[in-house]
Design a protein with these regions (language model features):
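Basic/polar, cationic surfaces and motifs that engage anionic cell-wall
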Residues: 1-7, 15-21, 102-109, 114-206, ...
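Short strand-loop junctions, especially beta-strand C-caps/beta-turns
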Residues: 30, 114-116, 215-219
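Sec/Tat-exported extracytoplasmic proteins
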Residues: 29-31, 138-142, 189, 232-236
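A general secondary-structure signal for short beta-strands and their flanking turns/coil
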Residues: 66, 106, 209-211
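Short secondary-structure junction motifs
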Residues: 68, 144-146, 237
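N-terminal catalytic cores of peptidoglycan-degrading enzymes
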Residues: 1-104, 174, 218
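Solvent-exposed beta-strand motifs enriched in subsets of small alpha/beta binding domains
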Residues: 199-246
Length: 246
């Protein structure tokens, strides 16, 4: 896990600064095909990259809306995956809306995963793992069980959130669900999740199944590697790629 911090101090929610004792975590996804953290977190800190539209959430009311979450998970400018804390954990966020029984804003830490096209398995695996590790870390420091982690659509069913589908529209596309997510968070808690150091990558002894990749060859000349890549793609492996090694 890589955890950075850029508090959205210009957001109205942050300025309001209402205290909150976390009793759970609510997982969201952004609902737009843009995996880049800079779309939501800003200004550029040297890692995020420049948002030329300036439409990040570090403004009073992003897009005219009263919205803010405690963390975003997505892609850095260099292509790496990271989590960004954007509100103090024990401050009320504006992420859940309201249901028949109230609002999870008063009880739950809100985490947004930046969506892509929803079809990239490698991106999904990376942000899924990052989210599980962040949730396990938060469960440990606040003494929460893995069962306290829900998504927005589950919050709606419980009557504590507005009617949204996230993340139930995305996870099943990759063989996952909130049930498997909570199980992975529970396993991370059981092995003793390592608290993160801001600005550093933390290697977690994770029991979450790894993704296994196949290398077909290594060549001293790029042309030879490219020729093999073309043969592999012609055979139907359209997601094959070249990577320069040493």
């Amino acid at each position: 896990m890589r955890l950075e911090r850029l508090i959205l101090t210009e957001n109205e929610c942050c300025k309001t600064a209402k205290p909150m004792t976390p009793r759970g975590i609510m997982l969201h996804s952004t609902g737009a095909d843009n995996p880049n953290l800079r779309r939501y977190v800003g200004p550029d800190d040297g890692l995020l990259g420049y948002n030329r539209f300036g439409n990040h959430w570090n403004t009073l009311r992003p897009g005219g809306r009263q919205v803010c979450v405690h963390a975003f998970i997505g892609r850095l400018a260099d292509g790496g995956i990271a989590s960004y804390q954007t509100l103090p954990w024990q401050q009320r966020g504006w992420h859940a809306g309201r249901g028949k029984k109230g609002s999870a804003n008063a009880t739950h830490i809100g985490i947004e995963i930046c969506e892509d096209s929803l079809s990239d398995g490698l991106y999904f695996d990376s942000v899924y793992r990052e989210a599980a590790e962040l949730c396990a870390y938060l469960c440990i420091i606040f003494g929460l069980p893995a069962e306290s982690v829900i998504c927005h659509s589950e919050g709606y069913a419980l009557g504590i959130a507005s009617n949204h589908a996230d993340v139930s529209h995305w996870f099943p596309r990759h063989g996952k669900s909130m049930g498997t997510f909570r199980a992975d968070v529970a396993r991370l808690i059981s092995v003793g999740h390592i608290p993160p150091v801001f600005g550093a990558v933390v290697n977690v002894p994770s029991p979450i199944p790894q993704v296994w990749r196949v290398q077909l060859g290594a060549f001293s000349k790029r042309d030879n590697a490219a020729a093999l890549l073309e043969r592999v793609k012609n055979a139907g492996f359209s997601d094959a790629f070249l990577i320069r090694g040493s």
